[in-house]
């Protein structure tokens, strides 16, 4: 060895705290919210995160002399206060692109949120945002189809897609499940959906469900003259079973399948997205288990990161919460990660939780899916928040209609078209929501009953995970 090797332990900040560093366009940038143990300097905590998520370990090792750590190491180049939290701070870290396998979200997350989250010097650690360089994005497959192609496949333009989750989500036989699908689609919905936890249980094996659903979709298409679909959940306990289910959906000439991307894993999701791209299949993505990871405001991974990772891994639709329904998520935060699903360039905007400029290049966009505790009274707000490139899914807000699922579907369709018409006429649909819906209900008894049924239903709970912005 030509260089002198000094054995022992040295402080992380001696190597990984580099405030003079100017990030390169090819660097992957990450923002962590850090809360260190009492008495540990911020610079040491931040440098430890940079080290343990890149090339570092707890001790100096002789094999460092066999490579160029200055080239490969992560660098903490900036520290910022967290508004309203004197114990926490933001650490901005730059990683050279060569640390990551091309196109592998699995590898990126293994590095950034691997062992470092169990580090004793930290009380809490949260990955708030990632700036993926365009050089990495170009190695990812991304959405197998994207918004434009999906609209062309479904022949739906000028409005959000309208759907619902089949309820009860567990317990129905395959035949009865297919009957509910048919009622919803003939009533006016574009799409129906398996819930995240319907796979292949004793009361309803997956092949039986697929066959009855396909029959229902095709019958509804013939009767309405519209393209219909159902998200067939292909999530399975093995990759082989996953692809067997996808292949059978293709044999049945179904337009769209579904995957639970967090419980299923990014490796499985990327593989399924590649299969969908090759086989002309749309891919709906559910985010089951996300709140375990993203809801704590000080520890875990923010959903904006999980949403960005999904766009790169591959999916044509992704659940994002509703703002107005039963699930966590404030308006500005939700708009922030919806932007990162759909836009080609998203500027840094702390008011929406975006810590970096994000250039997506020519990667197709992803439909934002609003689902969870929504009903017809929410329709104007949903249209205003999510816009046209979204899918609005009313589960209980369809099946809970006193006249049944078909009437619930009809009510939602009338409400949506009334709101789109009002918006296109220049009306302020959120401010005039009651007038717009009541006018439409004069010509739709289904909508009138729905408005009466859910007039008192609200989910007015404060958001747990709030944006860290200066008040």
Swiss-Prot record:
For the protein in the UniProt heading, the enzyme class is lyase
Positions bearing the site annotation: Transition state stabilizer: 326
Question: Is-annotated flag, keyword Magnesium?
Answer: yes
Q: How is the cofactor bound?
A: Binds 1 Mg(2+) ion per subunit.
Q: Which Pfam families match?
A: RuBisCO_large, RuBisCO_large_N
Coiled-coil region(s)? none
* Residues at which substrate binds: 115, 165, 169, 287, 319, 371
Q: Name one GO cellular component term.
A: carboxysome
Q: Which cofactor does it need?
A: Mg(2+)
- Determine the domain of life of the protein's source: Bacteria
Q: Which residues carry this modification: N6-carboxylysine?
A: 193
Q: Recorded GO terms, molecular function?
A: magnesium ion binding; monooxygenase activity; ribulose-bisphosphate carboxylase activity
Write down the PANTHER family for this protein, in alphabetical order.
RIBULOSE BISPHOSPHATE CARBOXYLASE (PTHR42704), RIBULOSE BISPHOSPHATE CARBOXYLASE LARGE CHAIN (PTHR42704:SF17)
Q: Which family does it belong to?
A: Belongs to the RuBisCO large chain family. Type I subfamily.
What this chain does, per the entry, is described as: RuBisCO catalyzes two reactions: the carboxylation of D-ribulose 1,5-bisphosphate, the primary event in carbon dioxide fixation, as well as the oxidative fragmentation of the pentose substrate in the photorespiration process. Both reactions occur simultaneously and in competition at the same active site.
State the name under which the record lists this protein: Ribulose bisphosphate carboxylase large chain
| Lineage summary | Bacteria, Bacillati, Cyanobacteriota, Cyanophyceae, Synechococcales
